[in-house]
Amino acid sequence: TTSTNATDKLFSQAYACINTCNAVINRAADVTEGDKNVLKVVVAEAKCLRAYYYLVLVTNYGNVTLVTTESTDTKIMNPTRSSQEEIYNLIITDLQEAAADLNTTPMDGNYARVTKKAALGLLARAYAQGAGEGLSENGVSYWQRAKEVAEDLIANMASYNAYLYDDVEDVWAQSNNRNNKEALFIASGPQAGTDAFTYGSYGANKLFTFTFCDPNKLSDIYPVGSKQNYFYGRVNNNYYAPSKYLVDCFDARYDKRWENSFTTAFSLFSMVQAGWRTYDDKNATITLTEDLCTKYGIDSKFVGKKIYPYVDVNAINLGSNGGNQYVASVWPKGEYSGDVNKLVKVKNPYVNPYPLAEDEDRFIVYLSKEYLSDAEKAKRGYICVNIDDLFAADGKYKETFIDAQQTNTYTLFPSLNKFNFNFEGGFYGSNLQCKTGDMFIMRMAEVYLIAAEAEERLGNGAKAAEYLNVLRKRAWRNEADFEAN
């Protein structure tokens, strides 16, 4: 394997986890005391996890070496690659046995532990991936098996304690992060302020810092530095931006997954609730000067106009278990009193209004998915950047100025907001880099996609469309447009 840290770490850690699973599975027969039903579930959990890790390995590295026994001090100097059939046979068998023995509710009420729906979801995924390798089971195509498992999970969602939200916004609502009803399998982040958080090693969970751009690159109009950004967090890495291809996959006129995936309008914030920053503080409310308007291409008629904070951020002290959490509420448009009683809770404060209105006065910069002409930009009292202008002809991001004034707007990009958590218990603010929400490994929507792909592969295009349309409808911005299309 490569010595590159990320890929090597994935490979090594997957095998380390497999070794633990092997120990649980193989030592279970030696356990003579305790509740046999509990033991059965623990073994089923280990089989589900072992199958998952092997699925990760075969997906990323191809034919790896199957190991089903606990490691010893003896090193295997010449490991042999197992065949696709051997690897998938183990994955399928583990998941079938796990699904048979797991309950629909998690052991000890710990929602982070795998249940029957997790095993079934992964089984459908494994069949679909194996089908792509041309595999079959007793003469039956893996596509047929993927169809059967996925459709059973869909048809019997309630009995498996599975769920699909009617509105895609609810999937990413901050209040739904913990115990998300659509989740089949998660990587659970610890509740900030608890002993599990305090004594665990969770400082490395900084994913959002890599997927967000830094609006402070426009420091004269966005004066709050990354180390003091209590709203977005310390977004100082800025490595991962969506490709031109990915951006073009969205038709944001109809698809509200766009703003529920990417933040494209950036604002300042007040901290009235915390008593740290008033509503009209110079770092919360900006007045457009002639110089700022000239520099950023804002029409001169907006000189003297104020841009107000979009949110107010509260500071909630964690006491002896850490620093503060910074939870945001939204100032309604047109509300300038600074009265915290007027604040409203929204599903996700990082989901900006879309499309951004011409008269919006709570955002400093807007990255527009739809191309805005100069005349259209002139109607807006904030910085407008066409996302298409961020890309060169070869589809790569430009690395130099995109405007005549040579501003740093070229450093901005649509920012993936799915790892930027903002709820009490999911945001540890000691250095504004660590956020500890739950992350999906698999959710129910994927099962619909698997069912659709399997049906299409088996020649049932109309049935495939039915499954796809369930997902399309809940993502559609206006139901009337969905019905018309």
Describe these PLM feature segments:
Residues 32, 58-59, 63-65, 106, ...:
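Short coil/turn linking the two alpha-helices of tandem helical-hairpin repeats
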Residues 1, 125-380:
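An aromatic- and glycine-enriched ligand-binding surface/loop that stacks and positions planar moieties
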Residues 1-61, 76-89, 95-111, 385, ...:
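Conserved, well-structured interaction surfaces
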Residues 14, 88, 140-143, 461:
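TPR-repeat structural position
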